[in-house]
Amino acid sequence: MKNNSNNCFITINNKNYNLTEFIDVSDIKEKKLIIKLNGINKITDASYMFFNSTMCALPDIDQWDFSKVINMKFMFAESPYFKSLPNNISKLNTSNVTDMRHLFWVCNNLLSLPDISEWNTSKVTNMSKMFCCKNLKSLPDISEWNTSNVTDISGMFDGCDSLVNLPDISNWNISKVTSLENLFSYCRNIKYLPNISKWNTSNITNISCLFNGLEKLLAIPDISKWNTSKITTMFSLFNQCKSLKSLPDLSKWDTSKVTTMGLMFNHCENLTSLPNISVWSVTNVEDMNYMFQGCKNISSVPDFSKWKAVKLRQKNGMFDDCDKLVIKPNIKGKSD
């Protein structure tokens, strides 16, 4: 947390700490109670402000002026005792904030968040791993957030094990986003996702683990028209989507730049067929390890004989435990 005034201090357990230098407030030992925060209107950097806090509750923040704050990364992260946060967090002026990465990350006792739906996110560029709280039962309505300048939302909901619904983020502007890695990964109790079919994915390079570990997911939105022309990795994309019975038509995806497809459909145990991915360009793919492993209800696969996997180096166990697959294709790689 950084500011530029000699009048800024934090009072913890009746002792004042000067905030004129960059400090991690979590370094102040045995903080149980923040009594007051003076000079909060001078602060520009609130990163790590309550990181790994031992407090059970935060002070009233009605008087906080966040209008100059540009950095909120890790602000509440890894604070194991927070079960809730003050409702008036919703009133923070976030109009100049550019970084919200890991904001509530691993606050594993949080059951809910205040209504942050009206936060001004117009300047935010990084929202990666923003939530990642395994006991959160619900999230505020963040459907109207301005994401037009965001470049990274990777892992934003990663590991939110207790969520049964996600906010409707279907209309988010992700035109500048480059990574969707782990975005919904291990949201184990989600059955349906927002309709993300119309997302502008023209700048996405990484969709690794996007739907990884969604064990109860019953359907994938129609992502058949996604622009995948810049994507280089699809590692573990649908891995462990054990309840899925079908996938969208992926035949028109441009995979010409993809280098990694390992674990892509691994343990999609209820799939009975695959999309026609035999038309994919795999000329740059180097890794297909365990790509279809554990797809135990698939009895046939597309004709992969036309695949030209000239750079393929790793293809271990591609069709292992595909119990109903009588004839297992031999995908030829670089050494074949």
Task: Go through each PLM region and give its residues.
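Negatively charged
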Residues: 1-336
